[in-house]
From Swiss-Prot:
SUPFAM superfamilies: BPTI-like, Elafin-like. It is found in: Secreted. This is Fused toxin protein. PANTHER family: KUNITZ-TYPE PROTEASE INHIBITOR-RELATED (PTHR10083), SERINE PEPTIDASE INHIBITOR, KUNITZ TYPE, 3 (PTHR10083:SF376). Residues 31-81 form the BPTI/Kunitz inhibitor domain.
Length: 152
């Protein structure tokens, strides 16, 4: 890798470290930055998170400069900046079913969400169907407060 490439990588890593929230409960702050094409003459298709439309959208990157809201694929953008769908399941009654510890949805694999149960957080499979009645459930980190009612 050339020294210019290493400097660019170092710059992006420094920017990422500065813009990542300390709490880990929200998407990285760079997700709210506008699309920035950069200073070179290239025309590389990339994706950025548009905080106004709340979607990952395509733009053309020049190949140098720009900011960290710049992803090679729409999936990378979505995984980094969009909250995962679904809600956390009710707290498991049985012991031994604990999932991986997490800080936010983005630290959980696949469609799992980061759920808080009595002060501990763990990755759990998201629930997508409507509840038959109003139920008190734990919540995904960064969305509705724990213990809030989930309406039908």
């Amino acid at each position: 890798m050339s020294s210019g490439g290493l400097l660019l990588l170092l710059g992006f890593l420094t920017l990422w470290a500065e813009l990542t929230p300390v709490s880990g409960q929200d998407p990285p702050r760079f997700c709210s930055l506008p699309a920035e094409t950069g200073e070179c003459r290239g025309r590389i298709p990339r994706f950025y998170y548009n905080s106004a439309s709340k979607q990952c959208e395509q733009f053309f990157y020049s190949g140098c400069g720009g900011n960290a809201n710049n992803f090679e694929t729409k999936d990378q953008c979505h995984y980094t900046c969009v909250e995962k769908p679904g809600v956390c399941p009710p707290r498991p009654q049985q012991q031994g079913q604990e999932g991986k510890n997490c800080e936010n949805d983005w630290k959980c694999p696949g469609q799992q969400k980061c759920c808080r149960y009595r002060g501990k957080t763990e990755c759990k499979d998201a629930v997508f169907e409507k509840f038959a009645s109003t139920t008190r459930t734990p919540t995904s980190i960064g969305s509705t407060p724990v213990g809030s009612s989930v309406p039908t």
